[in-house]
Design a protein with these regions (language model features):
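N-terminal secretory signal peptides
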Residues: 1-5, 18-21
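N-terminal export leaders
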Residues: 6-12
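Alpha-helical transmembrane segments
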Residues: 13-17
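C-terminal motif of bacterial Sec signal peptides marking the signal peptidase cleavage site
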Residues: 27-29
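Short, surface-exposed polybasic-aromatic patches that bind anionic ligands, especially phosphate groups
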Residues: 32-327
């Protein structure tokens, strides 16, 4: 994580009716499950699933876009094959029920969740086992529906691990990190819910906002984020948790099959800035079924095709991830 750590840190008729109300409210009508589990990716009314089509454009949207790069192309930071010897994207694993938990020694222990993490033998690590990058490890425990995420995770050789930070998320809950706390991501957000997955694209629908990075952020966070990763107070830099929406003028029909659901999601749910990194880089899960040539066509979409939006109307409480519909 490119941080500058400023602080250490849902079948009855009634259910069908509720689903219809959710659609009318601008929230998702269903809770897609984590593949291989019965776990939903947070409740359907969680901020990740909120629709932002009607969110107002910020008055300084142009400045924010220019800071990220108005002429820079959109990038799928995921795909098939290898890059520098590692899978392209951020992998995750559904661990076996009862997977033993191991102790993790955290650099930012005051903002990390203790209690042990169910790290399997030879877990999938972002960038590969030999990577010196962000080295995220994402694990889903399928019986309790708990998501465990680590940043900068390294084995110690004695069965224990060390990591920069870690967060444990109840996927059945809208609980958030304490304000000011990081997670395994700079913004204090969960990572897995914001990743583009092949199974979603193959099904033709991504029902959530997409995790995105920017090269320069400011010393601020906006709900649902809880942590910043910069010392700059420049108001024209995005905050952690800043939301960008793809303009409706971008026609997904002009793009190949694997790209269309991504474009629709960016117009419907938008992108959330979760870390410092490269301009307009979207995060996703590596999968050998990705067609990298199709994904590269996303570069035709430029920063100027985005607007920065005000997502504050979604918030019910700053310490909850539950979102309310926009007018």
């Amino acid at each position: 994580m490119a941080r500058r750590m400023a602080r250490r840190r849902i079948l009855s008729a009634a259910a069908s009716g509720a689903a219809l109300l959710a659609v009318a409210a601008g929230l998702t009508a269903c809770d897609p499950k984590v593949p291989g589990t019965e776990c939903t990716m947070f409740p359907g009314n969680n901020h990740w699933h909120a629709k932002v089509v009607n969110a107002p454009v910020l008055s300084n949207s142009t400045n924010l876009v220019n800071t990220v790069g108005a002429t820079k192309g959109l990038k799928a930071d995921f795909g098939s094959g290898l890059w520098d010897g590692g899978p392209i994207g951020i992998p995750y694993v559904v661990v076996a029920p009862g997977q033993a938990k191991v102790e993790v020694d955290f650099e930012y222990d005051d903002e990390s969740d203790p209690g042990g993490y169910p790290i399997p033998a030879d877990p999938p690590i972002e960038g590969g086992a030999g990577s010196s990058g962000d080295r995220h490890i994402l694990m889903v425990e399928p019986e309790e529906c708990v998501l465990y995420e680590l940043y900068s995770a390294y084995p110690d050789g004695d069965g224990t691990w060390s990591a920069g930070s870690g967060a444990i998320w109840d996927l059945t809950s809208n609980d958030q990190r304490p304000l000011g706390w990081t997670s395994a991501d700079a913004a204090g957000l969960a990572i897995l819910p914001g990743l583009v997955r092949y199974d979603e694209v193959a099904a033709g629908r991504i029902d959530h906002a997409i995790r995105m990075t920017v090269p320069q952020s400011r010393r601020a966070y906006l709900w649902p984020a809880s942590h910043y990763a910069s010392s700059s107070t420049d108001p024209n830099r995005p905050a952690m948790g800043e939301r960008f929406r793809l303009k409706a003028s971008v026609d997904e029909a002009n793009f190949p099959e694997q790209v269309r659901p991504i474009i629709v999601a960016l117009k419907t749910h938008g992108a959330i800035i979760a870390d410092n990194g490269s301009s307009w880089y979207m995060s996703g899960v590596p999968d050998e079924r990705w067609d990298n040539d199709q994904l590269r066509t996303l570069n035709q979409i430029k920063g100027s095709d985005f607007v920065a939006i005000d997502g504050s109307g979604l918030m019910i409480s700053e310490d909850s991830g539950e979102a309310q519909p926009l007018p």
